[in-house]
C-alpha cells in the first residue's frame, strides 16, 4: 500500500512539472498573453510590512528548546533527535523546569491541576 502511494505521488509530481513547463514554453512563444492586473496601480503604493520576529513560539511552531515556547506548560518536542522540533503541551513539571532554566519567557507561576486535590 505504501509503495502504491509513493508511486502515485511520483507520477503526480512528474505530471505537475511537465504541465508547468508546457505553460512556460507557450508563454515564451507568445502563444499566451500575459494577464494584466486591473488593481496593480492601487496596490503599488502600499509597501509590504516586514514581519517582526516574536520572542516566543506558539503551539505547533518551530523551536530549539523549551524556553522558545510561549506557554508556561509548553515544551519543545523533537522528532528524530534534534530535528523537526515544535512546541507541544507539557505538564506542571515542564513549567517548573522552565522556571529554573529559562532567562527569557520565564513562567511567573505554574498552574496546578485540580484532579489530585481532595475536597472536603
Swiss-Prot record:
Q: What is its main location?
A: secreted
Comment, domains: The presence of a 'disulfide through disulfide kOR' structurally defines this protein as a knottin.
Where it sits in the cell: the answer is: Secreted
Q: What is this protein called?
A: U13-lycotoxin-Ls1d
What family does the entry list? Belongs to the neurotoxin 05 (agouti) family.
Q: Where is the Agouti domain?
A: 56-95
One annotated GO molecular function is:
toxin activity
For this record, an example GO cellular component is: extracellular region
Disulfide bonds listed in the record: 56-70, 63-76, 69-87, 78-85
Record key words, sorted: Disulfide bond, Knottin, Secreted, Signal, Toxin
Q: Which residues form the signal peptide?
A: 1-16
Tissue spec: Expressed by the venom gland.
This protein's record includes keyword Acyltransferase: no
Q: Which ranges of residues are annotated as propeptide in this record?
A: 17-54
Posttranslational modification: Contains 6 disulfide bonds.
Q: Which organism is it from?
A: Lycosa singoriensis
Amino acid at each position: 500500500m505504501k509503495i502504491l502511494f509513493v508511486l502515485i505521488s511520483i507520477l503526480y509530481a512528474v505530471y505537475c512539472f511537465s504541465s508547468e513547463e508546457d505553460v512556460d514554453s507557450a508563454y515564451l512563444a507568445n502563444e499566451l498573453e500575459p494577464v494584466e492586473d486591473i488593481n496593480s496601480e492601487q496596490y503599488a503604493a502600499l509597501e509590504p510590512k516586514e514581519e517582526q520576529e516574536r520572542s516566543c513560539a506558539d503551539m505547533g511552531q518551530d523551536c530549539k528548546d523549551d524556553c522558545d515556547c510561549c506557554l508556561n506548560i509548553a515544551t519543545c518536542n523533537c522528532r528524530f533527535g534534534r530535528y523537526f522540533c515544535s512546541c507541544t503541551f507539557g505538564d506542571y513539571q515542564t513549567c517548573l523546569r522552565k522556571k529554573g532554566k529559562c532567562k527569557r519567557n520565564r513562567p511567573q507561576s505554574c498552574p496546578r491541576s485540580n484532579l489530585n486535590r481532595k475536597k472536603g
